[in-house]
Amino acid sequence: MFRRRDTETAGGGAANPGPVALPAPRQPLLPTYPPRGYLGQLDPAFQSALSKRREGANLEDFVWYHATELPDGTVLPGVWDLRGHESTYLGGVDFAGKRVLELGPATGYLTFHMERMGAEVVSFEAGFDVSIDTLPVKGEDQPWERLRVMQETIDRNHDAWWYLHRTFGSSAKFVQGNIYDMPGDLGIFDITVVGAILLHLREPWGALSQAAQRTTETMVVTEPLQDDLDPPETNIMRFSPSAEHHLTNWWSIYPGAVDSMLGRCGFGKTETTMHSQRHHLAHDIGSDAIDQRMYTVVGHPVF
């Protein structure tokens, strides 16, 4: 059922919503999941090797997706500024003692926030086949140069994630793979967080269903509300690339569509929160930030 709760914009300093009451844990949809590619990434030796590989990166070369405050008080500006409004963005969910799968961590701001809230976090990012989720462009069979630039940006995001991992003394894990065919040895999670990535995926349903098969308690999905042509509860997902040469924005997805997809995944007890977050358009940190309208759908299993 679609239930809506409104909050003030992030700039208005509204109090965060309280925790969402959790039902009793359920058994996952697929209690045993066959292992597939990209196996072994949770092994401590592999994680250590990943960290060491990123140690030589220069701070000035990082791309900061989220504004982040370091322990010494230094603030690193980012495309999004969620500081002080993390709970709203994450639907008011209680992460204490939970194993969390985070899809699309970018530079890791929410990774380490959830860890500070008591979660064990596994951050999942696109693998080397990132081009499968790029939009085709008329007249270009293989837009290699733009793909190369996009992959470099993603790689610098990963450098930033590992920099913060070391800075905060984190125990979070970082894995890569195909979001439509996740590694089978990731295990089962209490909570999955899907943070503003469905609009970038050619198959949002495929990604949600993959995550739901590994989740027992809660699905948290946050997306931008990109237009208001229809009521939020409308079950609509529009093909809506933002510009002819933009590679990654596929869809304008309404809360009602996310609600319906979660229901089909077995998480039909939902609550939707409308909110706003500070955002620099076109990833231009030098531009004036806007209050980007967002929504978060929290889904629990229906027994």
PLM segments and residue spans:
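Membrane-proximal basic amphipathic "stem/tether" segments
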Residues: 1-57
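Conserved alpha-helix/loop element of class I SAM-dependent methyltransferases that forms part
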Residues: 74-98
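Short amphipathic alpha-helix with an adjacent loop that forms part of the alpha/beta core around
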Residues: 91, 181-188
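Conserved class I S-adenosyl-L-methionine
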Residues: 98-106
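The conserved SAM/SAH-binding core of class I Rossmann-like methyltransferase domains
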Residues: 101, 124-125, 222
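Class I SAM-dependent methyltransferase SAM/SAH-binding core
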Residues: 109-181
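S-adenosyl-L-methionine-dependent methyltransferase catalytic module, highlighting the catalytic core
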Residues: 154, 180-184, 193, 202-210, ...
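Short SAM/SAH-binding signature in class I
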Residues: 188-196
